[in-house]
Every structure is written in structure tokens, then in C-alpha cells.
């Protein structure tokens, strides 16, 4: 049993990008699907689809990874911030600026999952799920 399924998702994406895989399959949940869709909107992955592989009981998210022209990684760094044992909540004023604004902090707010930029604009804080650049 996984104690932190979000950390598992981020690790699968990190490992797949380092080995230059085209896609990676992740056990599906609503939260992970929203996180993957946010990564698509922010331009870090190409696409995401929810499928059920033949002969399996549970849905998976098939994340299509994105690379640069020379197969360089688009995601250079991806890291879990708030963990089950140590939650990280911040107000809108204290939202982190990742790589001086070049990266993204994913924040779980009362308005859903938002990148730090949008959360700051809307004046909402929340739980910092992960950071990436």
C-alpha cells in the first residue's frame, strides 16, 4: 500500500523523463488527473488520458511526456513539497516563487489546483503540493 500516491506519481514522471519514455502509466484518481491536466496547461507534459488497460480492474492515467527539439527534458526538476507527515500550507502572500518565476509551484486551494501565479492573482493560499521547473 502506498503512503503517498502523489509522490509516487511525481517519481514515475521523473523516472520516465530521465529515461526518455514517450508515455508513463499512473494509477488513476481525480486528484492525480487534475494535477496531470495542470501540467498539460502549464506546458510540462503533452497530454493525459484516462484509460482502462485490457484485463485490469482499475483505470490508469496515460501521461504523454514532452521533450525539446534535441530530446532534452522539459521537466528538469519535480519535487513533492507537502507530504502526509509534514503538510505545507501557505497564504497568498507567502506563495513561493520557484526559480524566480520560471518554475511552477502547484497549490491545492479552495478553488481547485492552481499554479502559484494564478493563486497569487486570485489572492488565495493553500497547500503547496509540488514544485517543478
Swiss-Prot record:
GO terms for molecular function: rRNA binding; structural constituent of ribosome. It holds the Pfam family Ribosomal_S8. InterPro entries: Ribosomal_uS8 (IPR000630), Ribosomal_uS8_CS (IPR047863), Ribosomal_uS8_sf (IPR035987). The keyword rRNA-binding applies. GO terms for biological process: translation. Transmembrane segments: none annotated. It comes from the Bacteria. Part of the 30S ribosomal subunit. Contacts proteins S5 and S12. One of the primary rRNA binding proteins, it binds directly to 16S rRNA central domain where it helps coordinate assembly of the platform of the 30S subunit. Belongs to the universal ribosomal protein uS8 family. This is Small ribosomal subunit protein uS8. It comes from Deinococcus radiodurans (strain ATCC 13939 / DSM 20539 / JCM 16871 / CCUG 27074 / LMG 4051 / NBRC 15346 / NCIMB 9279 / VKM B-1422 / R1).
Amino acid at each position: 500500500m502506498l503512503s503517498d500516491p502523489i509522490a509516487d506519481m511525481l517519481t514515475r514522471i521523473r523516472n520516465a523523463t530521465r529515461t526518455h519514455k514517450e508515455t508513463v502509466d499512473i494509477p488513476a484518481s481525480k486528484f492525480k488527473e487534475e494535477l496531470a491536466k495542470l501540467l498539460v496547461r502549464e506546458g510540462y507534459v503533452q497530454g493525459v488520458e484516462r484509460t482502462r488497460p485490457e484485463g485490469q480492474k482499475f483505470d490508469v492515467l496515460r501521461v504523454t511526456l514532452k521533450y525539446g527539439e534535441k530530446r532534452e527534458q522539459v521537466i528538469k526538476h519535480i519535487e513533492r513539497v507537502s507530504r502526509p507527515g509534514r503538510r505545507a500550507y501557505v497564504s497568498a502572500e507567502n506563495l513561493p516563487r520557484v526559480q524566480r518565476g520560471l518554475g511552477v509551484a502547484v497549490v491545492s486551494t479552495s478553488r481547485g489546483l492552481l499554479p502559484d501565479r494564478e493563486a497569487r492573482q486570485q489572492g488565495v493560499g493553500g497547500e503547496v503540493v509540488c514544485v517543478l521547473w
